[in-house]
Amino acid sequence: MGRVVVDVMPKPEILDPQGKAVAGALPRLGFGQFTSVRQGKRFELEVDGPVTPEVLAAAAEAAEQVLSNPVIEDVVRVADAEADAAATISSGNLA
């Protein structure tokens, strides 16, 4: 069974009150090095079988038509979750 990850973010010109609230809290909690936060959404779509280019194309279409509001959001990533996790682990980043 495969899995596709879709990340959606607010368009840059759209106010992000959740991100602003998090950005305000970070310095108070000892994380002053972060100056800005944008909060988005992550979707994980499971499929029967492997993630093929056709599955990724269908996920991208679903992301544009159903998972995001194109007036205020951008789809910033559609990826095979397994390949994405392998890249994250090999780079030493947190998964």
Name every feature range the model reports, one short phrase each:
Residues M1-A95:
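Non-catalytic terminal accessory/regulatory regions of metabolic enzymes
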